[in-house]
Design a protein with these regions (language model features):
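Canonical Radical SAM [4Fe-4S] cluster-binding loop centered on the CxxxCxxC motif
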Residues: 2-33
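Conserved catalytic alpha/beta cores of large enzymes that bind or transform nucleotide phosphates
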Residues: 8-9, 24, 38-43, 47
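Short glycine-enriched, charge-decorated loop/helix-capping segments at active-site entrances
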Residues: 22, 123-127, 206-212
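Active-site oxyanion-binding pockets that recognize sulfate/phosphate
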Residues: 25, 156, 205
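Ordered, soluble secondary-structure elements with a strong preference for glycine-centered loop motifs
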Residues: 29, 160, 209
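Conserved SAM/AdoMet-binding glycine-rich loop
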Residues: 40-195, 199
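Radical SAM enzyme [4Fe-4S]-AdoMet core and its adjacent flexible, acidic
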Residues: 194-212
Length: 212
C-alpha cells in the first residue's frame, strides 16, 4: 500500500518484445519540482509512508539523482520510503547506488532479459554481460548482498545455449561476490526470475510464434 507518482512516460530503449515501449511514445519526463511536489502531497494528504517512482525505466530520468536528493530532504526525517521499481543496468552509477541505498534497504532488481549476448542483441536489449557484472560489483561494493535478475524464455531465435546462459550469468554474479572481500560469514543471495515470452501487438515481435 503505497503512493505512486509517474516520473516519466514512454521509453528511450526500444526492446523488441515490449509493447509499452512502443505504444507510450514519445518519451517525456516530468520535472523534478513537479514530481517532488506530487510525492510530498500524496504522503502528507493521504497518510502514505512509502512512495513509488513509477515508469518503464525510472533510472533513465535525466535528473534522477537530483530528484532523489530533493525528496530525501523531507522523506528521511518523516521516515517515508522511496521505491524505485525500474532500474536499468547501464544507468547505474556509484552516486545513484549510494542514494538508492538510503531509501531501499533490501536488494536490487535488474533485467538482463536473456542469457547470452547474441539473444540480447536480437531483442535490442542493449546491455552487455560485462555491464551486468560491473553493476553487480558496484552493488556489492555499496553493501548489497541480494540481487534479483529478471529473464525471459521462449524469445524468438532462442536456443538451448541461451537458456543455459541464464544459469551461467547467475553463477558469474555469485562468483563475483565471493571474489571480493566481505565480512566473514556474510553470503550473497542471487534470485532468478523467469517469465515466458508472449508476442504483443504493435511490437516487432507481434507475429512471432509463442513456444508451447
Amino acid at each position: 500500500d503505497r503512493a505512486v507518482t509517474e516520473v516519466l512516460r514512454g521509453c528511450i530503449r526500444g526492446c523488441r518484445f515490449c509493447q509499452a515501449g512502443y505504444i507510450y511514445r514519445p518519451y517525456r519526463e516530468r520535472s523534478v519540482d513537479v514530481i517532488n511536489r506530487q510525492a510530498y502531497d500524496l504522503c502528507h494528504n493521504c497518510g502514505y509512508d512509502e512512495v513509488s517512482l513509477s515508469s518503464l525505466s525510472t533510472s533513465d530520468h535525466s535528473h534522477l539523482a537530483d530528484l532523489m536528493e530533493k525528496m530525501l530532504v523531507w522523506a528521511e526525517p518523516e521516515h517515508v520510503d522511496l521505491s524505485l521499481p525500474s532500474l536499468r543496468i547501464d544507468s547505474m552509477t556509484p552516486h545513484l547506488l549510494e542514494l538508492v541505498q538510503r531509501v531501499r534497504k533490501s536488494g536490487l532488481t535488474f533485467a538482463p532479459e536473456a542469457g547470452s549476448q547474441r539473444l540480447r542483441d536480437a531483442i535490442n536489449k542493449n546491455i552487455t554481460e560485462q555491464e551486468v557484472l560491473d553493476t553487480c560489483r558496484m552493488s556489492f561494493e555499496s553493501g548489497y548482498t541480494a540481487v534479483k535478475l529478471y529473464f525471459m524464455m521462449g524469445l524468438p531465435t532462442e536456443t538451448l545455449e541461451d537458456i543455459k546462459g541464464i544459469a551461467d550469468t547467475a553463477q558469474q554474479v555469485v562468483d563475483l561476490y565471493y571474489s571480493m572481500e566481505h565480512p566473514k560469514g556474510k553470503g550473497v543471495q542471487v534470485t532468478i526470475s523467469v517469465a515466458c515470452f508472449v508476442p504483443k501487438p504493435d511490437t516487432p515481435f507481434q507475429f512471432c510464434a509463442q513456444d508451447r
